[in-house]
Design a protein with these regions (language model features):
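N-terminal secretory signal peptides and thylakoid transit peptides that target proteins
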Residues: 1-20, 24
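Glycine-rich loop(s) and the adjacent beta-strand/alpha-helix scaffold that form part
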Residues: 369-372, 376-445, 622, 653, ...
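Conserved redox-cofactor binding core of oxidoreductases
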Residues: 251-369, 393-394, 567, 574-600
Length: 676
């Protein structure tokens, strides 16, 4: 028996369906025309010219001419499509349609969006020619309508004021771009990096480098991590949506990369680094009862080396006021001082367009601070490393619809450190495929401030609603983001001083290993006791009885009754050692029964994030794929422009995983390109 492919089967089925439509249309005509049926029985179409429109990357218009039995001519207006992709596919698409005489064509590889729109136009024209009504072009989806997806006119060579010929061009000098730049420079490659920020104000955002198995960590007593265990744990937390090859590349190389990065750091600066969530204390938990594992492996740079814009004064050495920019400057200066013959950095110069030769990327056009256009021809490839799109509201509305649907009328996107998305735009214009679920750093997750898994959490109705210690802050906030708004309150009894010491490493988690942080938290409880029954400015309450605590929190009679019943039920669960309600790890089951009692009231909201952390689908070597999942020659993505590293949401089995991945995969990409 002859075998047919699934594609061939679908073509046959489609043709059969079209025949059925034809028969139905003719039957309708016969019923209407009566005695004229015999003379028109052989006709498939009403001769004439028909027009249809559809949405590709922009508006597409088709004009098709029909005889009684065939499509005789097709005209396509693809002027709103990408020059080198959709527009370039025009002749091929027309030929395929003419050969097939219907819309069941393969389309053009790399121009899937345009091909699908052309097929829709063909269907509509055929429907009209058969006496039916054209299907109205649907309202443009957010993806189709967003103006950023439409590529600008190509900048002509006549406007280029200077040309560079290099091996590799890198767009963006954050952690990934700088790491890739340094590696290529050390390998002797002719490399040029574009950085939009001026030299005098350039900095790299963030203060944690998450990694495993560096000599730095091991020398401080941090245990070695099994790479296979690490990969499987990561993939579980990423819902299986990360690229396991990229994650394993990170696991195997992050330690050596951090040691390499620190090798060029000023010793005085290096002495001011520390390890987050280290050392462990007697209460530290690393693996939860559900199997999720959390690791120590975060290097922090704690130095009040930058000024607070509001006060003009140096910041204190407190969490959230730390920057790694001195570490980045030391690495950049090392390259500038030692590899000026083959490595060039252009500050205040922004990449604006990729240079294409058909579907191949051959370089990039940039614009300097004076408005001049520069052309960089890159023999071995262009690296997109300009970060995410958290600073571009239109792109967030377009690319994060699942998150936007979670918002209340009072919530919206806010990412103060977000980039403008320009490198992602350039990649899309070149035909790059973005991952389906683009991850962000907490846009779709609500977390408790100073995330503490030990206390009982109740909602504004006084009821417990989830496992308080299910996972790290990002994953643990999924349910609240999708099901709750309003006040969330943490409930403690007088054993709070040991409860706050039991935790596990996590982004935004309470740092139980830092004595200053612990003392500051203990002071908040003492302050609540001093002003009882009133609240402190931080939202802490204290009362001698649970009844009085409920009153202080403002619960009405029904809420108060629910709250007291909730505490009673929770205490029963704690004493049994098994949380039959929500499955909480028994090590975090702390009964609420020894007065005085405390509460910390917060009102979580959705929409704030530091950055977006998702982008293009790539090969295992970070080469960008097109819409048909085929590599685009000459185009690569790293850092927060590269997708499929975290799954649907940023996760942190080690805090600082974003920067750690940027450094590691940026360097690995540099190695790969150097070997080309």
């Amino acid at each position: 028996m002859k075998k047919i492919s699934r594609k061939s089967f679908l073509k046959l089925a489609s043709a059969a369906a079209m025949s059925g439509i034809t028969a139905g249309a003719l039957a309708a005509c016969n019923a209407a025309s009566g005695s004229t049926a015999a003379s028109s029985a052989a006709a498939k179409y009403t001769p004439g010219t028909y027009t249809a429109t559809a949405k590709g990357m922009g508006d597409i218009t088709m004009t098709a001419t029909f005889s009684e039995t065939a499509i005789t001519d097709i005209q396509l207006d693809l002027s709103n499509e990408t020059d080198s992709i959709g527009q370039a596919a025009k002749d091929d698409l027309i030929q395929q349609l003419m050969d097939a005489q219907n819309s069941t064509i393969d389309g053009v590889s790399g121009a899937t969006v345009t091909s699908d729109a052309v097929k829709q136009c063909m269907n509509d024209c055929i429907t009209q020619a058969m006496g039916g009504t054209a299907v109205s072009a649907p309202e443009a989806s957010a993806e189709q309508a967003s103006s950023w997806r439409t590529a600008p006119e190509a900048i002509p060579d006549s406007e280029i004021t200077k040309t560079y010929d290099v091996d590799v061009a890198i767009i963006g000098m954050g952690y990934a771009g700088l790491s890739c730049y340094r590696e290529l420079a050390e390998e002797g490659k002719n490399v040029l990096v574009l950085e939009a920020m001026p030299r005098e104000s350039w900095w790299t955002v963030g203060h944690d480098i998450g990694h495993i198995n560096s000599d730095y960590l091991l020398s401080h007593g941090v245990p070695k991590v099994d790479e296979v265990e690490f990969l499987n744990n990561w993939m579980m937390q990423a819902h299986g949506k990360a690229n396991p090859a990229l994650v394993m590349k990170f696991a195997k190389n992050s330690g050596s990369t951090v040691d390499w990065w620190l090798d060029k750091i000023n010793p005085d600066t290096l002495a001011k680094t520390r390890i987050h969530f280290w050392p462990d204390n007697e209460y530290t938990v690393h693996q939860l009862n559900n199997g999720m594992h959390y690791y120590t492996g975060t290097l922090e740079w704690w130095e009040n080396s930058w000024e607070n814009p509001a006060s003009g004064e140096k910041n204190n050495n407190t969490a959230g006021q730390l920057e790694l920019k001195d570490l980045s400057w030391d690495n950049y200066n090392y390259v500038e001082e030692n590899f000026s013959d083959n490595a060039t950095a252009l500050f205040g110069t922004k990449g604006v367009q990729l240079v294409m030769d058909g579907a191949k990327v051959t370089g990039v056009i940039a614009q300097d601070s004076d408005g001049n256009y520069l052309k960089i021809n890159a023999k071995n490839g262009v690296v997109l490393a300009g970060g995410g799109f958290g600073g571009n509201k239109e792109m967030m509305d377009d690319l994060l619809p699942n998150i936007k649907r979670l918002f209340t009328k009072d919530e919206d996107f806010f990412a103060p450190f977000g980039r403008d998305g320009s490198t992602i735009q350039m990649g899309v214009w070149a035909g790059g495929r973005l991952e389906g679920d683009i991850s962000t750093m907490n846009f779709d997750s609500m977390t408790m401030p100073d995330y503490l898994p030990g206390p009982l959490w109740v909602d504004e109705n006084g009821q417990r609603f989830q496992n308080e210690a299910f996972a790290g802050p990002e994953i643990n906030g999924f349910f609240m983001a999708r099901a709750k708004r309003g006040n969330i309150t943490s409930i403690y009894d007088s054993t709070y001083n040991t409860q706050i010491l039991r935790g596990f490493p996590g982004h935004q988690a309470f740092n139980y290993s830092d004595p200053d942080v612990v003392d500051a938290m203990l002071a908040k409880f003492e302050a609540a006791k001093a002003v009882s029954p009133n609240a402190t400015e931080d939202g802490f309450y204290c009362a001698d009885t649970l009844d009085e605590l409920a009153d202080a929190l403002g619960f009405d009679a029904d809420q108060k009754a629910a709250f007291l019943a909730t505490v009673e039920e929770y205490n029963t669960v704690c004493h049994s050692g098994v949380d039959t309600d929500f499955g909480k790890d028994p090590r975090f089951l702390n009964a609420v029964e020894q007065g005085p009692f405390y509460a910390h009231l917060t009102t979580p909201s959705l929409g704030f994030a530091l950055v977006t952390t998702g982008g293009f689908v790539t090969t295992n070597d970070q080469q960008v794929l097109n819409e048909d999942y085929q590599p685009i020659e000459g185009l690569y993505a790293s850092g927060n422009t590269c997708g499929m590293r975290f799954g649907p949401e940023y996760i942190t089995p080690i805090p600082g995983a974003s920067i750690g991945m940027c450094l590691t995969l940026g360097r690995e990409l540099g190695k790969y390109l150097a070997a080309k």
